[in-house]
Amino acid sequence: MAKRKVIKKKIVRKNIAKGIVYISATFNNTMVTVTDEMGNAIAWSSAGGLGFKGSKKSTPYAAQQAVEDAMNKAKEHGIKEVGIKVQGPGSGRETAVKSIGGVEGIKVLYLKDITPLAHNGCRPPKRRRV
């Protein structure tokens, strides 16, 4: 039986100066995606993907780590200026936005909230009783 060859996928460097950072902060997790201006994904990260499990995924610290990981990946592709689009009501939302400003060599152009608001659409989940 022949041995399988392990082929490593080569990371292609894209020299992109401007990008958009999408932060999706849910109650359970925080996802960060960095795209170019056309919407093609360059880098992404999430709190769960970094090893945070269970209730630790929804913490502000996990959101900060996810943003720093995604921005470091994006800096390898030459990103220098970003616009931020935030979605969702999660607890890591504010920390994620602040930590983008703290990344060295990245200039924030704008900040926009793209959370969808229902005009009396679906019934929301029932209130929690703890």
UniProtKB/Swiss-Prot annotation:
Q: What binding partners and quaternary form does the record give?
A: Part of the 30S ribosomal subunit. Interacts with proteins S7 and S18. Binds to IF-3.
The record, for SUPFAM superfamilies, names:
Translational machinery components (SSF53137)
One GO cellular component assignment for this chain's record is:
ribosome
Entry's family note: Belongs to the universal ribosomal protein uS11 family.
Protein name stated in the entry? Small ribosomal subunit protein uS11
Give the UniProt record's GO annotations in the biological process aspect: translation
Domain of life of the organism encoding this protein:
Bacteria
Identify the InterPro entries for this entry: Ribosomal_uS11, Ribosomal_uS11_bac-type, Ribosomal_uS11_CS, Ribosomal_uS11_sf
- Cite the entry's keywords alphabetically: Ribonucleoprotein, Ribosomal protein, RNA-binding, rRNA-binding
Summarizing the function annotation, the protein's role is: Located on the platform of the 30S subunit, it bridges several disparate RNA helices of the 16S rRNA. Forms part of the Shine-Dalgarno cleft in the 70S ribosome.
